[in-house]
């Protein structure tokens, strides 16, 4: 995931934004940096339920046991939120993902306070889906 920053840089960049408009633009930019998801991966089995937008998340485990995530959405801000979540889970094993709590990171970024209720619910649905897939692999 070389095109996306690591967790610490994500937080630094987020905190450098002067206002919420800049933060939204940064989130959208992160989504634009994500690699394209192949059409065959945009299948019902990779679809995340509970999001107003269409969201697909693909999870694969590499030979070293590390989870590799790919995703997409038909909404720019949601695709950016997918990127944020993927950054937080980068280089983790399935068990690491199950044990990792993203909420402190969201609090540091003051992220959830500035999302609409439907986007917050969608974000939670993405996290639940990733954790469930990781639990099935661990």
Swiss-Prot record:
Pathway note: Cofactor biosynthesis; iron-sulfur cluster biosynthesis
Active site residues of this protein: 51 (cysteine persulfide intermediate)
InterPro entries per record: Cysteine_desulfuration_SufE, Fe-S_metab-assoc_dom
Keyword Disulfide bond part of the UniProt annotation: no
Predominant localisation class: cytoplasm
Entry keywords, A to Z: Cytoplasm
Compartments in which it is found: Cytoplasm
Designated name of the protein: Cysteine desulfuration protein SufE
Species this chain originates from: Escherichia fergusonii (strain ATCC 35469 / DSM 13698 / CCUG 18766 / IAM 14443 / JCM 21226 / LMG 7866 / NBRC 102419 / NCTC 12128 / CDC 0568-73)
Gene behind the chain: sufE
């Amino acid at each position: 995931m070389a095109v996306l920053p690591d967790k610490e840089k994500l937080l630094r960049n987020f905190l450098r934004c002067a206002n919420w408009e800049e933060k939204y633009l940064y989130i959208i930019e992160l989504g634009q940096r994500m690699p394209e998801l192949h059409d065959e991966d945009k299948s019902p089995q990779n679809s995340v339920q509970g999001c107003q937008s269409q969201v697909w998340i693909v999870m694969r485990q590499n030979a070293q046991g590390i989870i590799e995530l790919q995703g997409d959405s038909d909404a720019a801000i949601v695709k950016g939120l997918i990127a944020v979540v993927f950054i937080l889970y980068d280089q983790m094993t399935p068990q690491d993902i199950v044990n990792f709590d993203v909420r402190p990171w969201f609090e540091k970024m003051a992220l959830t306070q500035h999302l609409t209720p439907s986007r917050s619910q969608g974000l939670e649905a993405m996290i639940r889906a990733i954790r469930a897939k990781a639990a099935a692999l661990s």
